[in-house]
């Protein structure tokens, strides 16, 4: 039987409402903890290991990209062997996951032009 293993985080209220509706219609609402808010805050309150991460934010702006900021917060919480997907290919994010010192193995996939798949190895 399915057991809840972690939350779904989303910033946009409409996407949260759609996710809740879709999960309810599928009979899965009891298995997902949907948290609305900025991932840079909500990720700090997970309270356990993370099994899978999908980073699909907005690239751009000055300073570290949103993907890089999120990865620096969540990386210590990802279990060894845990996969991470990012579909924007921000250069500072790629530098992080491709640096062996940060504990990931990473490769680009030919999807959407800039999808990166990573596995936490240490």
Annotate each language-model stretch with its function.
Residues 13, 41, 57-60, 89-91:
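Short, glycine/acidic-enriched loop or turn micro-motifs at the edges of active sites
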Residues 12-52:
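S-adenosyl-L-methionine
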Residues 5-10:
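Conserved SAM-binding motif I beta-strand of class I
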Residues 1-3:
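Conserved SAM-binding loop of SAM-dependent methyltransferases across substrates and taxa
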């Amino acid at each position: 039987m399915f057991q809840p293993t972690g939350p779904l985080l989303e910033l946009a209220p409409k996407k949260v409402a759609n996710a809740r509706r879709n999960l309810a219609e599928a009979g899965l609402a009891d298995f997902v903890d949907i948290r609305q808010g900025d991932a840079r805050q909500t990720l700090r309150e997970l309270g356990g290991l993370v099994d899978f991460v999908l980073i699909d934010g907005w690239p751009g702006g000055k300073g570290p990209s949103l993907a890089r900021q999120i990865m620096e917060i969540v990386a210590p919480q990802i279990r060894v062997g845990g996969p991470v997907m990012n579909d924007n290919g921000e250069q500072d994010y790629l530098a992080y996951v491709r640096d062996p010192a940060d504990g990931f193995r990473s490769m680009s996939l030919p999807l959407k032009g800039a999808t990166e798949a990573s596995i936490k190895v240490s």
